[in-house]
């Protein structure tokens, strides 16, 4: 497999922070999106941003902006498909996605996702972290948390994903399980690297984690 392309998923709005683009919120004088870009770009062959609406608001990032390509489907599922369609036009085999509101994800994300895909016909891997004691008490048999916005996705299955979304697929992990998706386990200490900013309190915590 050639080095995958990267796609930042930035379709979410900061509804719990008054609206607007969550990725444009700042910590340490830099937007969340810029931090995600700087962390993912060295790991991939090329990088694009998945977002809808006026692309001009992201001009400072210097990235191509790819809008959702699936009618009637919103959220990260549509963003993954849009990224796969973009990558197909670039002649790539796979993409790695990262969420725009998660600025501390591992700097070896791509390498470890690719390593976990060894031997797969179609590379399909999601990032995971161990569940904590409290999470384990809440029920469920899984001992890990899956992070479907952080994954390695095969371009060859994009039409299959498109059909699944059009058929009403709501949880992309159902689709990854159907196609033999694997997991790459990442350490969650001293904090979960896939911690994402959803609330003003999260933004404050992110500022503290920078220190």
Where in the sequence are the language-model features?
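Nucleotide and nucleotide-moiety/phosphate-recognizing core
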Residues: 1-172, 177-193, 200-201, 208-211
């Amino acid at each position: 497999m050639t080095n995958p392309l990267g796609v930042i998923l930035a379709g979410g709005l900061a509804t719990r922070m008054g609206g607007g683009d969550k990725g444009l919120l700042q910590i340490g004088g830099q937007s969340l999106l810029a931090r995600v870009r700087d962390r993912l770009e060295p790991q991939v062959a090329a990088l694009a941003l998945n977002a809808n609406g006026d692309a001009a608001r992201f001009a400072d990032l210097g990235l191509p902006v790819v809008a959702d390509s699936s009618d009637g489907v919103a959220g990260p599922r549509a963003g993954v498909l849009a990224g796969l369609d973009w990558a197909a036009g670039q002649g790539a085999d796979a993409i790695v996605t990262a969420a725009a509101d998660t600025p501390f994800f591992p700097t070896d994300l791509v390498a470890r996702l690719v390593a976990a895909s060894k031997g797969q016909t179609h590379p399909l891997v999601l990032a995971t972290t161990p569940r904590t004691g409290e999470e384990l008490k809440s029920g469920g048999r899984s001992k890990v948390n899956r992070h479907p916005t952080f994954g390695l996705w095969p371009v060859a299955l994009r039409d299959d994903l498109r059909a699944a979304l059009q058929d009403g697929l709501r949880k992309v992990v159902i689709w990854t399980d159907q196609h033999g998706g694997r997991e790459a386990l990442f350490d969650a200490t001293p904090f979960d690297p896939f911690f994402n900013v959803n609330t003003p309190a999260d933004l404050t915590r992110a500022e503290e984690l920078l220190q």
